[in-house]
Structures are given as structure tokens and as C-alpha cells.
Swiss-Prot record:
One of its GO terms (cellular component) is cytoplasm. It comes from Xylella fastidiosa (strain Temecula1 / ATCC 700964). Transmembrane segments: none annotated. InterPro entries: Coprogen_oxidase_aer, Coprogen_oxidase_aer_sf, Coprogen_oxidase_CS. The gene is hemF. The record marks 175 as: Important for dimerization. Pathway: Porphyrin-containing compound metabolism; protoporphyrin-IX biosynthesis; protoporphyrinogen-IX from coproporphyrinogen-III (O2 route): step 1/1. Involved in the heme biosynthesis. Catalyzes the aerobic oxidative decarboxylation of propionate groups of rings A and B of coproporphyrinogen-III to yield the vinyl groups in protoporphyrinogen-IX. Keywords: Cytoplasm, Heme biosynthesis, Metal-binding, Oxidoreductase, Porphyrin biosynthesis. Residues 239-274 are annotated as: Important for dimerization. Homodimer. This is Oxygen-dependent coproporphyrinogen-III oxidase. Belongs to the aerobic coproporphyrinogen-III oxidase family. Substrate binds at residues 92, 108-110, 257-259. Its cofactor is a divalent metal cation.
């Protein structure tokens, strides 16, 4: 089996596993699947769960697409690949829970291959996961980063620190001077050794289940009211801003002629903006600002023990 087919099989199975867990936790709604084909080559399956007991919207898509010319969002970083044939597969998800005390989350794991005259000229892995709470709990953030650190451990002492830092630097709303959330892991252009890099991608994909769903289980029954709901919708606006202005995957998908419905399914179903909003000093809403900057969560928790 080719390298590409092995990755593809893992990713389709990962999508199935995550969907099963989400449906079990939600207990009310189910995913609806949309198979689609891309005129330029390839296709995918988009799955969407809406109006659940736990998840207001949970979107997870698998795609396997190809083309004859790299879009600008990719070739600007790899100018030597301009004009090469390419093929990419990946799983991407964004979950928007109903309860404001359950964080929004994002996962992406992908594999990219470029060929010229029938010969592979480049191939690499990319991906990661990150967490966007509205009412953060230190316990949850430490759990999230503990899972991230532990899954990175077999790949070297520097892996967690490097990919956490990359995540902190990537998921930044520069016009707001704040991070999108409390970070996680981010990596791209991983191309040193296929077997080891593929092992890492699987560790990230598998680790996501251990990192996120215990938080959901812990928080989804937390009581909330109109105030918390309004703040959740306001903060979702930041999510929209990042995805439309800065996210490489969104830009790549749209510039490569991707399926807009599947690409933009990451956006929340409801959102609000408010001009000049500032939370009351000392409020639970104001506390969020302390979390929207790079921090060494595990070291801080160790010191506090």
C-alpha cells in the first residue's frame, strides 16, 4: 500500500471514531453525511451534527483532493513547487458546543504530496489541535496540555515545547493582540521520515479524543443563563475573524477551488458582534483576557501544587 493510501485509510477511520464518540456524548442528534466530488479532482465526505443536547454544531470533514497547480497560499511558502501536480488529504473538525462553559475546539491532520513528471518532489504532514474556552477552568487547560505533552514525549524532549510555541504563534488575531484560545499543538512541513512523521500524526489524531472529550463530559451540564450565552456568541465572533483572515487551511481551500460549503462549515451557526464592548472589571468575562496570551500552563500548574 502506498504512503498516501495508508494516511488516507487512517484519516477516514479517525473521522468515524470521532463521530461515534460525539454521538454517544450528545445522546440526541446524529451526524448527517454529504458526499461530494470536486470538478478539478477528488472529493470528500462532510459530516454535520446540529442542534444536539451538547453540541450546537459539530462539523468534521474528510477530503482527498488533487490539482495541477498549487494555489498561492501554498506556493508562496514553497515557490519551488509552483506548477507541480499535487494531492492532499486531511481531516478537519470544529465543534461549537451549546453550553458556554464547554470550549470550542479545532483539530486538523493532513498529508500533502507534490509531483512533477510523475515523480514525487515533496511530501509532508501538518496539523494540530487547539482549544478556545469562553469561561476557562485551569483544570481543563492543564489537562489539555498534559495530553499534548505526553503524546509528544516519544518524539523527543523538544517536540511539545516547539509545537506548542508554533500553535501560540499561529493562532493569533494580530489585529486584536490576543490568541484565539489557550493553544495546543501546531505543526507543518513535517517531512524528515515518513514512518516517524506518520506515527506523530496518528498520536495527534488519537490524542485529541483523550484531550477534549473529558472536558466536554465535565462541563456540559454546568448551569448558565442569558449573560453567559451572550458572551459566548460575542467571543465566537473572534473565531470567525481568525478563520476568514488568517487560517491557512481556509485560504488554501478557497484558492484551490475547494468546496466552499465544506470549507466554511467551521464557522459557528450563531454569532454576534458588539461595537466597543468591554467586560466589567473583575467579572468572569474579564477573566478570559488572562488566558488569551502564550503561557506555560504546565509549569504554572507545577509551581502552584
Amino acid at each position: 500500500m502506498s504512503h498516501f493510501d495508508r494516511v488516507r485509510d487512517y484519516l477516514t477511520a479517525l473521522q468515524d471514531r470521532i463521530c461515534n464518540v460525539v454521538e454517544t456524548i450528545d445522546g440526541q442528534s446524529h451526524f448527517h453525511q454529504d458526499h461530494w466530488q470536486r470538478t478539478e479532482g477528488g472529493g470528500g465526505r462532510t459530516r454535520l451534527l446540529r442542534d444536539g443536547a451538547v453540541f450546537e454544531q459539530a462539523a468534521i470533514g474528510f477530503s482527498d483532493v488533487c490539482g495541477t497547480h498549487l494555489p498561492p497560499s501554498a506556493s508562496v511558502r514553497r515557490p519551488e513547487l509552483a506548477g507541480a501536480n499535487w494531492r492532499a488529504c486531511g481531516v478537519s473538525l470544529v465543534f461549537h458546543p451549546k453550553n458556554p462553559f464547554v470550549p470550542t475546539t479545532h483539530l486538523n491532520v493532513r498529508y500533502f504530496r507534490a509531483e512533477r513528471e510523475g515523480k514525487q518532489v515533496a511530501a509532508w504532514f501538518g496539523g494540530g489541535f487547539d482549544l478556545t474556552p469562553f469561561y476557562p477552568f485551569d483544570e481543563d487547560v492543564v489537562h489539555w496540555h498534559t495530553v499534548a505533552r505526553d503524546l509528544c514525549a516519544p518524539f523527543g524532549d523538544e517536540r511539545y515545547a516547539a509545537h506548542k510555541r508554533w500553535c501560540d504563534e499561529y493562532f493569533v488575531l494580530r489585529h486584536r493582540n490576543e490568541t484565539r484560545g489557550v493553544g495546543g499543538l501546531f505543526f507543518d512541513d513535517l517531512d524528515k521520515d515518513f514512518e516517524r512523521d506518520f506515527d506523530y500524526q496518528r498520536a495527534v489524531g488519537d490524542g485529541f479524543l483523550d484531550a477534549y472529550f473529558p472536558i466536554v463530559t465535565r462541563r456540559h451540564d454546568t448551569p448558565y443563563g442569558d449573560r453567559e450565552r451572550a458572551f459566548q456568541l460575542y467571543r465566537r465572533g473572534r473565531y470567525v475573524e481568525f478563520n476568514l483572515l488568517f487560517d491557512r487551511g481556509t485560504l488554501f481551500g478557497l484558492q484551490s477551488g475547494g468546496r466552499a460549503e465544506s470549507i466554511l462549515i467551521s464557522l459557528p451557526p450563531l454569532v454576534r458582534w458588539e461595537y466597543g464592548y468591554h467586560p466589567l472589571p473583575g467579572s468572569a468575562e474579564a477573566r478570559l483576557a488572562d488566558y488569551l496570551l502564550p503561557r506555560d500552563w504546565l509549569e504554572e500548574s507545577r509551581i502552584c501544587e
